[in-house]
Amino acid sequence: MDPGIANHTLPEEFEEVVVPEMLEKEVGAKVDVKPTLTTSSPAPSYIELIDPGVHNIEIYAEMYNRPIYRVALFFSLFLIAYAYGLDGNIRYTFQAYATSSYSQHSLLSTVNCIKTVIAAVGQIFFARLSDIFGRFSIMIVSIIFYSMGTIIESQAVNITRFAVGGCFYQLGLTGIILILEVIASDFSNLNWRLLALFIPALPFIINTWISGNVTSAIDANWKWGIGMWAFILPLACIPLGICMLHMRYLARKHAKDRLKPEFEALNKLKWKSFCIDIAFWKLDIIGMLLITVFFGCVLVPFTLAGGLKEEWKTAHIIVPEVIGWVVVLPLYMLWEIKYSRHPLTPWDLIQDRGIFFALLIAFFINFNWYMQGDYMYTVLVVAVHESIKSATRITSLYSFVSVIVGTILGFILIKVRRTKPFIIFGISCWIVSFGLLVHYRGDSGAHSGIIGSLCLLGFGAGSFTYVTQASIQASAKTHARMAVVTSLYLATYNIGSAFGSSVSGAVWTNILPKEISKRISDPTLAAQAYGSPFTFITTYTWGTPERIALVMSYRYVQKILCIIGLVFCFPLLGCAFMLRNHKLTDSIALEGNDHLESKNTFEIEEKEESFLKNKFFTHFTSSKDRKD
């Protein structure tokens, strides 16, 4: 309802006559002051009606409303985030050493691109599963994927196996992050939402300073540095498991009749019906496969086409691009619009500008970050002469500063309750930061400039990244849609990662070899400098002509990447101005927790709101005419 009208008090006779009687004639249905479903509405099918995961988590939240329970729950989220956050910092470093050990360091972006394509689709997949089968069940599945992928990565002997392990790891990590974000949202009101969302991010404050020590202690033994997390992370998940089992116990003890069996579909439906209704339609398997193939065909070739031998004109680069754009994308759109019963991209949600432009922001966040961050560690070690410990800490500064700023802002939003001004301010900080990164991009004199730029980048990120997520959750309106909207936001975030990694990889693999060849005349030496930079710098130390040539090449390429990031900050700012500026209320969602409201209900609400506006305006102008 329009705020200007909401702030006026309707005359008594208007409230008594218009709402119960006149409104019924206008809407054409029996309505209350709070509209409900009419008997003429078609009964929802079993699949549309039942979301046991959403229903039960609301009951669990009631059982866990004591402060001591909430503290224990959020501490368990913190513990898991601490584990995967430290792993991420360390793995980011050792991934560079792993690809370099295969003499294929330039394929680092390809590995990242493949992982993020899988992660993007995995967000929606896990969100839908968690709504149906519950948060805890999907958390267990995610942990299994995480550990399995970690083991495969640590034992990989070539880039192919490393990429396969990375896909499983990323899928598991995606599920864990999503479930933690959703649980944090399930147990927090909108005005506390930003602070709750930052609980899983708080470990970055610690990990920034200790990850460098850990990587230095492990040294270049990247296999152990990655593999040890296959058992560390599952151990860190035990406290959350205890909390989830405890709240389930309390719910069964005090509200057993209200709970819905999370695997009821398996009992009520035959196996064939279950596979068709749940696995095929509800999860939209066809849509997921098509969108995965599309992004794989379009993005991965970008990172493979360059290098010492350009391959843009070869069939294995052109064919996937043609298949992706000409065949797969039209098929996906046709399926989603015409045939899918539960589209991956629900059009009724995306049409809301508060959701659509928030998704665009999510895309540009990671796209822009990858422009400066994809090869930042390599640039710091090779072109800025940083140690392993120093480079690891510097690359973590972004997360460190953003978490501190975002947490402080979380307390501010409890009272302020508006998000849009902070989002605009944060993006403005990014514009300045990328401008600084264009200037400070290499050589030993860039040390302080890069640190300052990354701190400013983190300051801006803390002001708008998670704030945008809180904004899009408010735009979802109902708790039932919160997990889906969150997954769309995180999926778009990962798609931005995929495009960013793809573009940065394309720039790196196509321009860097040429720049190195211009400055290093020996083809064999140039190939070594490009393919195995960490091995190269041990032989050609700081100050040697060969090292200076490599530094100048890195400076040139990093400048191009940062300019691309700077340019795309302006569309990011434009999207921020188009967002809704919701007031964050003392409820889980703007329209409460009733997740069984159908489309008919919302149509009645819209008609009621429009009707009340018109009638109030008529009454107001009539009264004014009478006074005149």
Curated annotation (Swiss-Prot):
GO terms for biological process: intracellular iron ion homeostasis; siderophore transport; transmembrane transport. The chain crosses the membrane at residues 68-88, 107-127, 132-152, 164-184, 194-214, 225-245, 285-305, 317-337, 354-374, 394-414, 420-440, 448-468, 488-508, 559-579. Its main location: membrane. Keywords: Endosome, Ion transport, Iron, Iron transport, Membrane, Transmembrane, Transmembrane helix, Transport. The keyword Protein transport does not apply. It is found in: Endosome membrane. GO terms for cellular component: cytoplasmic vesicle; endosome; endosome membrane; fungal-type vacuole; plasma membrane; vacuolar membrane. InterPro entries: MFS_trans_sf. GO terms for molecular function: siderophore uptake transmembrane transporter activity; siderophore-iron transmembrane transporter activity. It is a multi-pass membrane protein. Belongs to the major facilitator superfamily. Involved in the transport of siderophore ferrioxamine B and so has a role in iron homeostasis. PANTHER family: GLUTATHIONE EXCHANGER 1-RELATED, MAJOR FACILITATOR SUPERFAMILY. This is Siderophore iron transporter 1. It comes from Saccharomyces cerevisiae (strain ATCC 204508 / S288c).
